[in-house]
């Protein structure tokens, strides 16, 4: 296990959370606005402390009395919803270097580590001197991920990573997340309400409703739980509603990972529909 919640509550915002984020796997943390998703992630970093229960983060216990979060914050990388809010220097190189220097990374290995972080996310070295504020939305997201990966954390948390991205950038993000998981063996937690995105990558799904665990499934079971998503206040794409209502399509044998674009083509090409 990477992170385990043991009967965790926080004031009246989160109630009796019991859940394990599995090591080396993708987990989607979903729920309507105000359900407690981001607050749950803040507990993993020690930004807020549980008022009841405890959680284990990579073997380190966080409870209401915990004071030292040095190891945890180095091993859990966090990419915020709006990457530009993280940037405050005038070059891509300086952005990545800042976190490394702050964590006392060896200066003689700094350039190599910065280059390695850019390579991991597919950004060219020619971007090193570029102002981060001039990057496209997809490039800013990649840079924010590179900053998080530069310290080689075991866990990466992405907060609403698709919210400002176009379709091309979302496709590139999907491929990057696959690479991070498979090649670098990271545990990835994705906070999102983008159901289309959830369907593109196989993973675990934790649905919160009013601060409580409402659903704990794997992504191949998502179509069987559409009504529960809607009752929790989630917005479900029209194509998913269509699939859910059509017995012919619902009973069709799709792969565990359902790519919406591929599905649309299958629907169009099915002469019996």
Regions found by a protein language model. Name each.
Residues 45:
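Helix-to-loop junction immediately C-terminal to a conserved catalytic motif
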Residues 53-64, 71-72:
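Conserved ABC transporter NBD signature motif
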Residues 109-126:
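Conserved ABC ATPase "signature" region
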Residues 131-135, 139:
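Conserved ABC ATPase signature
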Residues 145:
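Hydrophobic anchor residue at the start of the ABC signature
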Residues 152:
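Conserved catalytic motifs of ABC-family nucleotide-binding domains
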Residues 156-159:
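Catalytic Walker B motif of ABC-type/P-loop ATPase nucleotide-binding domains
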């Amino acid at each position: 296990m990477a992170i385990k919640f043991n009967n965790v509550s926080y004031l009246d915002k989160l109630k009796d959370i019991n859940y394990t984020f599995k090591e080396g796997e993708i987990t989607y943390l979903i729920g309507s606005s105000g359900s407690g998703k981001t607050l749950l992630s803040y507990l993993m970093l020690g930004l807020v402390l549980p008022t009841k229960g405890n959680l284990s983060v990579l073997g380190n216990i966080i409870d209401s009395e915990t004071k030292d979060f040095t190891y945890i914050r180095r091993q859990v990388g966090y990419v915020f919803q709006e990457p530009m809010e993280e940037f405050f220097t005038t070059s891509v190189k300086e952005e990545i270097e800042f976190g490394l220097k702050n964590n006392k990374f060896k200066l003689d290995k700094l350039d190599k580590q910065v280059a390695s972080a850019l390579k991991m996310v597919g950004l060219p070295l020619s971007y090193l001197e570029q102002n981060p504020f001039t990057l496209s939305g997809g490039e800013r997201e990649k840079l924010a991920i590179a900053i998080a990966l530069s310290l080689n954390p075991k866990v990466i948390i992405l907060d609403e990573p698709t919210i400002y991205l176009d379709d091309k950038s979302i496709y590139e993000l999907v491929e990057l997340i696959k690479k991070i998981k498979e090649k670098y063996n990271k545990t990835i937690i994705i906070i999102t309400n983008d159901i289309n995105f959830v369907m593109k990558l196989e993973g675990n799904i934790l649905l919160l409703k009013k601060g409580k665990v409402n659903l704990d499934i794997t992504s191949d079971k998502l179509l069987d739980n559409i009504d529960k998503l809607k009752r929790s206040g989630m917005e479900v794409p029209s194509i998913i509603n269509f699939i859910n209502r059509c017995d012919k399509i619902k009973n069709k044998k799709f792969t565990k990972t359902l790519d919406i674009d591929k599905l649309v083509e299958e629907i169009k090409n099915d002469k019996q529909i």
